[in-house]
Design a protein with these regions (language model features):
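Short, conserved sequence motifs used for protein processing/export or organelle targeting and
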Residues: 83-109, 115-235
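Active-site-proximal cofactor/substrate-binding loop regions of enzyme domains
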Residues: 18-106
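G-domain G4 guanine-recognition motif of GTPases
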Residues: 71, 113-114
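Bacterial N-terminal signal peptides
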Residues: 5-14
């Protein structure tokens, strides 16, 4: 899971379409990944999403931390089908519990740097870590394709050499409003930011340096921007 989580640092890269190729280098520190698992069919979720939305104005956005809003599909049967829900996002949340990095599968549910985080429920702010990365990521954007190169740092080689790396690239939606006409949030206008609308992932085995090409297709829901993207109830 450490390897999978590490590669989420690709999320700091912009995937907008440029006329000329653009090269983007990962920073010299790990970027914190804050995942929210939510659903438009969950009456307890809007406050958590409102808080996540407020991070748009936080200092360090994209350089210190990256929020991602994953809508799960396991509440789609209770009166409202979430248009942003994906079975792959539900599977991703269940994987955290299966690997014992989270205690349960619930909405709203937070994962911070690969582990369950309940601080929001107690009015706490996340504690961003400031650590050296295991390697450098170089992304070259050319039209709708992206070439990703990873070079491990000396201190990162030991635990990376024996396994596979997964590259995760998500397209996030912003300034999205949905009028809900059924389910627990019936009659409410829900606002969303950092919404994971598409998640690409590829797995590669690595010897010393990785270079791979990925095709990223634009998917527009509301005003979108390109950045990097299981049934218990907590409500």
């Amino acid at each position: 899971m450490k390897l999978v989580f590490f590669t989420l640092l690709i999320s700091v890269f912009s995937l907008s379409v440029y006329a000329e190729p653009r090269v983007i280098q990962s920073p010299d520190h790990k970027v914190n990944i804050l995942e929210l698992y939510t659903s438009q069919g969950c009456s307890s979720c809007p406050p958590a999403e409102q808080w996540l939305n407020s991070l748009k104005t936080e200092e360090g956005l994209w350089t210190t931390f990256v929020p991602i809003n994953f809508h799960v599909d396991y509440w789609d049967y209770i009166g409202w089908k979430d248009p942003f829900a994906s079975a792959s996002f539900s599977k991703r949340q269940r994987l955290y519990k299966h690997l014992k990095f989270a205690r349960n599968v619930a909405t709203p549910g937070f994962i911070l740097n690969g582990k369950g985080w309940n601080g929001w429920f107690y009015g706490q702010s996340p504690s961003w870590v400031n650590e050296s990365p295991s390697g450098d990521i170089l992304a070259t954007l050319n039209g709708q394709s992206i070439e990703v190169a990873f070079t491990p740092k000396p201190q990162g080689r030991e635990h990376l050499q024996s396994g596979a790396l997964k590259v995760h690239i998500a397209i996030l939606g912003f300034d999205i409003t949905t009028k809900v006409t059924g389910g627990e949030n019936e009659g409410r206008d829900l606002s969303h930011d950092f919404v994971g609308s598409t998640l690409f992932q590829r797995e590669y085995y690595f010897i010393n340096r990785i270079i791979n090409r990925l095709l990223c297709q634009r998917k527009q829901k509301g005003k979108t921007e390109k950045k990097s993207r299981e049934k218990d109830r907590q409500s």
